[in-house]
């Protein structure tokens, strides 16, 4: 049983990063933000934890939003996938500056800049201490990068899906508009559904729930939180069918 006072640390994790964070709230890439994220990931990787990463592309394109402006949804989603690859390459560069060996694998083949997505090869990279960054989403339209993170985490045998956000975890209401909103420290997937809470998109959440993959939602903007999350410190919100309290 996982309790509010004690969580076990993890050896292989999937880190989901939103693309908007890479832009610092603007279009494009904010080098200071990416460098800070790279330093946090490097600290965790050098401690012996195997780290895989999926990054969104919202700082460049969002397929659903482009569709609302009249673009074909499939083509819009492919544009978003290319945006994720730009984020992946930026993170790879900053990780290498931190002395961390890193590989980018993409669901759309672009062999001059990245390996194709091969789960067995990705696992071998992780075993050798390399960080693996997955780009181009699922390689198909209509699938979010949340869903990509959940699917990749399951396929390469991660122990937890770490959802990095700009808030401290999952709240009963929007904490930006309701100062009385309650932060859940531990909660079951069933409670998430019953309370109508937002953790990840529906497909990603269903994948994790059906396959008993824990999700830890935490604040990336607090320096050192990736290491704390991996070590099992009581931060953020743990969504797990085995939690005993919250």
From Swiss-Prot:
Quaternary data: Homohexamer.
EC identifiers of the protein: 2.7.4.22
Function of the protein: Catalyzes the reversible phosphorylation of UMP to UDP.
Binding site for UMP: 57, 77, 138-145
Lineage: Bacteria, Bacillati, Actinomycetota, Actinomycetes, Mycobacteriales
Locations listed in the record: Cytoplasm
Keywords, comma-separated and alphabetical: ATP-binding, Cytoplasm, Kinase, Nucleotide-binding, Pyrimidine biosynthesis, Transferase
Catalytically driven reaction(s): UMP + ATP = UDP + ADP
One Gene Ontology molecular-function label: ATP binding
GO CC annotation: cytoplasm
Gene Ontology biological-process entries: 'de novo' CTP biosynthetic process; UDP biosynthetic process
Ligand binding (ATP): 16-19, 58, 62, 171, 174
Gene3D superfamilies hit by this protein: Acetylglutamate kinase-like
Major place of residence: cytoplasm
Family: Belongs to the UMP kinase family.
Regulation of its activity: Inhibited by UTP.
Protein name (database record): Uridylate kinase
Pathway given in the UniProt record: Pyrimidine metabolism; CTP biosynthesis via de novo pathway; UDP from UMP (UMPK route): step 1/1
């Amino acid at each position: 049983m996982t309790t509010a006072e004690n969580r076990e640390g993890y050896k292989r994790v999937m880190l989901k990063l939103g693309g908007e964070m890479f832009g610092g709230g603007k279009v494009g890439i904010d080098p200071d933000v990416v460098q800070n994220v790279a330093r946090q990931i490097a600290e965790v990787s050098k401690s012996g934890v195997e780290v895989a990463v999926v990054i969104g592309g919202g700082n460049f394109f969002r397929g659903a939003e482009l569709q609302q402006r009249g673009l074909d949804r499939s083509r819009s989603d492919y544009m978003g996938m290319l945006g994720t690859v730009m984020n992946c390459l930026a993170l790879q560069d900053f990780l290498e500056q931190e002395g961390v060996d890193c590989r980018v694998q993409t669901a759309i083949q672009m062999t001059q800049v990245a390996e194709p997505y091969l789960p067995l090869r990705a696992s071998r990279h992780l075993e050798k201490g390399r960080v693996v960054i997955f780009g181009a989403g699922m390689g198909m339209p209509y699938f979010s990068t949340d869903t990509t993170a959940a699917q990749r985490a399951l396929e390469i045998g991660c122990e937890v899906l770490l959802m990095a956000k700009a808030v401290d975890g999952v709240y009963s209401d929007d904490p930006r508009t309701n100062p009385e909103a309650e932060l859940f420290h531990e909660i079951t997937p069933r409670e998430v559904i019953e309370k109508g809470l937002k953790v990840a998109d529906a497909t990603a959440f269903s994948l994790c729930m059906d396959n008993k993959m824990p999700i830890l939602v935490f604040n990336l903007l607090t320096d050192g939180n990736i290491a704390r999350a991996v070590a099992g410190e009581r931060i953020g919100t743990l969504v797990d069918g085995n939690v005993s309290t919250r």
